[in-house]
């Protein structure tokens, strides 16, 4: 894919980096996503956008097993360097979404921290040459802010697959808040089952939903209620608000 991105980006590619579970561990070749950051020297628009859009469509046609399992963020180099202070347009293809433009700024700090710390260079300079320093404390604070935001986002997680994603994401956020570093969803779930025994059945069920071929698209209202309680409980622990699960359900 590196050569394809280089060719279809009209030679604007500055660097390409892979991160996520493929790098940090617990990658499942049949189910896990591949996360890529493509740094480009200018905005992705016009002909470049159209070429990349067609390239990603062809890739799925040629490799159907990877449908909805590739995430690439195309980020102009100035936008990456100034992400703390400026919100700029980037191009993204991600699971469940077509190739599209979106605004990105400080809300992408978690991604850029992981690229900077553990990203593997596929082409171009090391990622640290293209983005400013990001401290561990900044990373942990961003995870805490995202955990708080999940109290609102979780209400939209109506299918078992989405609910499982929410549960495991909050497990990972709690692990990061406790240990100051990132873990894979699998590692964080195993840890959280012991750390939060009252939630162990839900965490185990969520892990199974994401690892087995089941119908993840049917609405699950009962599951949503329990997931909402879990998210509010864990987010409260992370942010120090101390909101109980019963508060969330009421």
Features from the language model and the residues they span:
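Conserved NTP/Mg2+-binding pocket subregion across the NTase superfamily
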Residues: 57-160, 164-167
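Extended, basic/helix-rich recognition subdomains
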Residues: 148-205
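Short, well-ordered alpha-helical packing segments
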Residues: 2, 6, 53-60
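Structured mid-to-C-terminal alpha-helical surface segments
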Residues: 181-250
């Amino acid at each position: 894919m590196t050569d394809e991105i280089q060719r279809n980006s009209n030679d604007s590619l500055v660097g390409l980096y892979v991160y996520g579970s493929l790098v940090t561990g617990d990658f499942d070749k049949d189910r896990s996503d591949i996360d890529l950051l493509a740094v480009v020297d200018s905005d992705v628009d016009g002909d470049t956008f159209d070429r990349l859009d067609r390239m990603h469509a062809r890739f799925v046609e040629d490799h159907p097993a990877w449908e909805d399992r590739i995430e690439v963020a195309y980020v102009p180099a100035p936008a990456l360097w100034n992400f703390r202070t400026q919100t700029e347009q980037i191009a993204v293809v991600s699971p469940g979404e077509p190739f599209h433009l979106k605004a990105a700024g400080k809300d992408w700090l978690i991604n850029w921290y992981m690229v900077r710390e553990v990203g593997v260079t596929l082409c171009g300079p090391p990622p640290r040459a293209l983005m400013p320093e990001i401290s561990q404390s900044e990373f942990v604070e961003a995870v805490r802010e995202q955990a708080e935001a999940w109290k609102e986002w979780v209400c939209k997680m109506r299918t078992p697959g989405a609910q499982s994603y929410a549960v495991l994401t909050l497990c990972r956020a709690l692990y990061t808040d406790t240990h100051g570093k990132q873990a894979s969803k699998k590692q964080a779930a195993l840890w959280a089952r012991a750390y939060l025994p009252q939630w162990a059945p839900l965490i185990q069920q969520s892990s199974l939903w994401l690892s087995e071929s089941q119908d993840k698209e049917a609405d699950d209202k009962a599951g949503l209620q329990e997931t909402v309680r879990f998210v509010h409980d864990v987010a409260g622990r992370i942010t120090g608000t101390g909101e109980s699960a019963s508060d969330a359900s009421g």
